[in-house]
Swiss-Prot record:
Domain of life: Eukaryota
One Gene Ontology term from the biological process aspect of the record: proteolysis
Protein name stated in the entry: Probable cysteine protease RDL6
Active site: 157, 294, 314
This protein's record includes keyword Disulfide bond: yes
GO MF, any single term: cysteine-type peptidase activity
UniProt-listed InterPro entries: Papain-like_cys_pep_sf (IPR038765), Pept_asp_AS (IPR025661), Pept_his_AS (IPR025660), Peptidase_C1A (IPR013128), Peptidase_C1A_C (IPR000668), Peptidase_C1A_papain-like (IPR039417), Prot_inhib_I29 (IPR013201)
Maturation-removed propeptide residues: 27-132
Role description: Probable thiol protease.
SUPFAM superfamilies: Cysteine proteinases (SSF54001)
Family in the record: Belongs to the peptidase C1 family.
Signal peptide start and end residues: 1-26
EC supergroup of this enzyme: hydrolase
């Protein structure tokens, strides 16, 4: 029976290679057998495959690879234990799988504060008697959502949230989807502190108004670091303008649903949990607070097996979550919404198809 172990390892190798060659998402894993722990050999092999998938390399200084491997093992154990419970969502080996939870939190420390909101709360989407909202909405199917983007290690989620909301609105109003420049916001919208501060989408919307629009991603591409504002580029060739912006009434998921039925909406969430860090698929209803520290965009909503959810676009590339998206439980018992998703919702306004 000496051939059994090599055969098993060959099967494991082929399974993991298949997973790594599949469309990008948080890495799926071969299940553990009967709840038993994985062997060190298996974990080391998965770690090497994960490193290859994410282009990870480590220096030998101060035992960095050993520390990262230990973090990876801890996260893999956490994933296996969670997925064995058959809860409403699954975890996987995201790009953060070699980090401790504290390192993950420190990577994007920005914290948009609801008290910093501009006084732009509107009753535009407050529910009215007789309202009949669609049971489900998915702006991706309407061609109003560009491909998933990646903010890298720059704390620029606010810029990606702003841009995605404006891209979607422009498609709805003009019929044209244009990928816009987050880098212009990072470099030129100084009040939001680029990669280093707690940017707000409202402030970025106001910048677009003052700046007479925003350039395309093609003409002002993303660099992942904060640079000097290219004033020449920033004041010419504007491809999209907006007229105003408004805030959804805070702590009101029904108003938020009505807003999303009309357009993609920028939101803030609390992303600090290990479950959020390692989210892979299905409807997330896991632990999280309401101390907002990350900006995303709701691009739709729906229901599945009696559970309502939001379709939320992230800016961590396609190897996190469900190809870059997360479904967050909707109509949560707390009016702030799960992870505070109803606390800081806002959207741009465009009154005509002209971008002049």
């Amino acid at each position: 029976m000496g051939f059994v172990r090599p055969v098993c390892m060959t099967i494991l190798f082929l399974l993991i290679v298949f997973v790594l060659s599949a469309p990008s998402s948080a890495m799926d894993l071969p299940a553990t057998s009967g709840g038993h722990n994985r062997s060190n050999e298996e974990v080391e092999f998965i770690f090497q495959m994960w490193m290859s998938k994410h282009g990870k390399t480590y220096t030998n200084a101060l035992g960095e690879k050993e520390r990262r491997f230990q973090n990876f093992k801890d996260n893999l154990r956490f994933i296996d234990q969670h997925n064995a419970k058959n809860l409403s969502y699954q975890l996987g080996l995201t790009r953060f799988a070699d980090l401790t939870v504290q390192e993950y939190r420190d990577l994007f420390p920005g914290s948009p504060k609801p008290k910093q909101r501009n006084l732009k709360t509107s009753r535009r989407y407050v529910p009215l008697a007789g309202d009949q909202l669609p049971e489900s909405v998915d702006w991706r199917q309407e061609g109003a959502v560009s491909e998933i983007k990646d903010q890298g290690t720059c704390n620029s989620c606010w810029a990606f949230s702003t841009v995605a909301a404006v891209e979607g609105l422009n498609k709805i109003v003009t019929g044209e989807l244009i990928s816009l420049s987050e880098q212009e916001l990072v470099d030129c919208n100084l009040v939001n502190n680029g990669c280093y501060g707690s940017g707000l989408m409202d402030t970025a919307f106001q910048f677009l108004i003052n700046n007479n629009g925003l350039d395309s991603e093609k003409d002002y591409p993303y660099q992942g670091t904060q640079g000097s504002c290219n004033r020449k580029q920033s004041t010419s060739n504007k491809v999209i303008t907006i007229d105003s912006y408004e805030d959804v009434p805070a702590n009101d998921e029904i108003s938020l649903q009505k807003a999303v039925a009309h357009q993609p909406v920028s939101v803030g969430v609390d992303k600090k949990s290990q479950e959020f860090m390692l989210y892979r698929s299905c409807i997330y209803n896991g632990p999280c607070g309401t101390n907002l520290d990350h900006a995303l965009v709701i691009v739709g909503y729906g229901s599945e097996n009696g559970q309502d959810y939001w379709i939320v676009r992230n800016s961590w590339g396609t190897t996190w979550g469900d190809a870059g998206y997360i479904k967050i439980a909707r109509n949560f018992e707390d009016p702030k919404g799960l992870c505070g998703i109803a606390m800081l919702a806002s959207y741009p306004i465009k009154n005509s198809a002209s971008n002049a």
